[in-house]
């Protein structure tokens, strides 16, 4: 994953700089092959932007602010969806619409101005680039100090002692092959990747409209999806810090499974209002599950492989989203069987989520050993005091290396 090798900032700037020319070129392409190739490249670049920005937001925050910052980013994305729908209503030409949206992305190259868009200090420390990390942290400390005050002596000493207090090994030897010796990290990756895949794949099963394929149905489905995503962000912001990541993820997937089973078994006996209600409930809960599984994955994957691991989780979510266009290609044939399979997988997710650790208000794991210690407390044995999931959850330090 390039973000783990070349840095979050460099990947974000590179992909943002290429989005504009790629989008404008795709709108100007004359052949269907050129349009498909450039649209594929555009989606690839936007996925890189999404991953890089998500990592930088997460690694910049302290444990108490990670949820709020993640949900704020999701709400900004939902606002972008509403803006796109409004522009699509105004502009009937898709080529003009694509140029209008992607061309201004070139302006994001101004983020490359020194001191404006900073690299992740956490990534720099893990990569043993201590001088660059000290520079980034000093800039952040100076920007956040009260106006007119100098940087305190404690902050200066902390910056000077940064190299001695972070004896991390070089990360160039870390790869997916090295993860084979860390079964707990693999378990968390597989469970959260599978949950994210199902949460994205099952969404189209809850659309109460859109079967006719008319433009009004398309806009209504898009508005419904964006609206339920906004409601899911509000719901997560209210409940997750109170009841924990794992508990709310379990509740969301349970509601997803219940909505699927009701629609599968009682469709012929429900009126339109009940069908719409359970469809909105399933769409809402699947949106919440996708958002929370991504956040939980980013909090249990160590910094040394966070770019690769979170990229894998997001890729599985995007792969699950292909179930809707794949179903349309088959003209709706096998939709019931597909819904049955996805509902069964949702029930399997409910069982697997209980094996995940709780990460509320905890420091991010830095190296593979930290990630291996993040596990669900045993039901039969008292957990050791150095385990990441030890209760109480407030101000739990990372285990000693």
From Swiss-Prot:
Cell surface receptor for LCN2 (24p3) that plays a key role in iron homeostasis and transport. Able to bind iron-bound LCN2 (holo-24p3), followed by internalization of holo-24p3 and release of iron, thereby increasing intracellular iron concentration and leading to inhibition of apoptosis. Also binds iron-free LCN2 (apo-24p3), followed by internalization of apo-24p3 and its association with an intracellular siderophore, leading to iron chelation and iron transfer to the extracellular medium, thereby reducing intracellular iron concentration and resulting in apoptosis. GO terms for molecular function: transmembrane signaling receptor activity; transmembrane transporter activity. The chain crosses the membrane at residues 10-30, 35-55, 69-89, 100-120, 184-203, 218-238, 247-267, 277-297, 309-329, 336-356. Widely expressed. The lineage of its organism: Eukaryota, Metazoa, Chordata, Craniata, Vertebrata. PROSITE patterns: MFS, SUGAR_TRANSPORT_1. It is a multi-pass membrane protein. GO terms for cellular component: organelle membrane; plasma membrane; vacuolar membrane. PANTHER family: SOLUTE CARRIER FAMILY 22 MEMBER. GO terms for biological process: siderophore transport. This is Solute carrier family 22 member 17. Belongs to the major facilitator (TC 2.A.1) superfamily. Organic cation transporter (TC 2.A.1.19) family. Its main location: membrane. Keywords: Cell membrane, Ion transport, Iron, Iron transport, Membrane, Receptor, Transmembrane, Transmembrane helix, Transport, Vacuole. It is found in: Cell membrane; Vacuole membrane. InterPro entries: MFS_dom, MFS_sugar_transport-like, MFS_trans_sf, Sugar_transporter_CS.
């Amino acid at each position: 994953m390039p973000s783990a090798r070349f840095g979050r900032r460099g990947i974000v700037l590179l992909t943002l700089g290429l989005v504009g020319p790629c989008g404008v070129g795709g709108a100007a392409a004359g052949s269907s092959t050129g349009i498909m190739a450039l649209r594929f490249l555009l989606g690839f670049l936007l996925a890189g932007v999404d991953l890089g920005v998500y990592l930088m937001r997460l690694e910049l925050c302290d444990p108490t602010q990670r949820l709020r910052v993640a949900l704020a980013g999701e709400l900004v994305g939902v606002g972008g969806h509403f803006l796109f729908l409004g522009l699509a209503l105004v502009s009937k030409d898709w080529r003009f619409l694509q140029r209008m949206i992607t061309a201004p992305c070139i302006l994001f190259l101004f983020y490359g101005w020194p001191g404006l868009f900073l690299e992740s200090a956490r990534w720099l420390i893990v990569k043993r680039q201590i001088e660059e990390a000290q520079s980034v942290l000093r800039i952040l400390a100076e920007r956040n100090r009260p106006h007119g005050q100098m940087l305190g002596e404690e902050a200066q000493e902390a910056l000077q002692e940064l190299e001695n207090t972070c004896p991390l090994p070089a990360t160039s030897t870390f790869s997916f092959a090295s993860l084979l010796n860390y079964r707990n990290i693999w378990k968390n990756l597989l469970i959260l990747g599978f949950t994210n895949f199902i949460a994205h794949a099952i969404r189209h099963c809850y659309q109460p409209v859109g079967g006719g394929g008319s433009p009004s149905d398309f806009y209504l489905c898009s508005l419904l999806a964006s609206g339920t995503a906004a409601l899911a962000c509000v719901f997560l912001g209210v409940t997750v810090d109170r009841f924990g990541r794992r508990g709310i993820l379990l509740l969301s997937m349970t509601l997803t499974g219940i909505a699927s089973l009701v629609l599968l078994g009682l469709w012929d006996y429900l009126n339109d209002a009940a069908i719409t209600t359970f469809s909105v409930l399933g769409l809402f809960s699947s949106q919440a599950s996708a958002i929370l599984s991504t956040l939980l994955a980013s909090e249990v994957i160590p910094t040394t492989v966070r770019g690769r691991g979170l990229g894998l989780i997001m890729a599985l979510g995007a792969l699950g989203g292909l179930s809707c266009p794949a179903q349309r290609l088959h003209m709706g044939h096998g939709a019931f069987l597909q819904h049955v399979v996805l509902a069964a997988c949702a029930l399997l997710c409910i069982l697997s989520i209980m094996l995940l650790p709780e990460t509320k208000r905890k420091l991010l794991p830095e190296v593979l050993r930290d990630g291996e210690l993040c596990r669900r407390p045993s039901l039969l044995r008292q957990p050791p005091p150095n385990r990441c999931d030890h209760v109480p959850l407030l101000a739990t330090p990372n285990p000693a290396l």
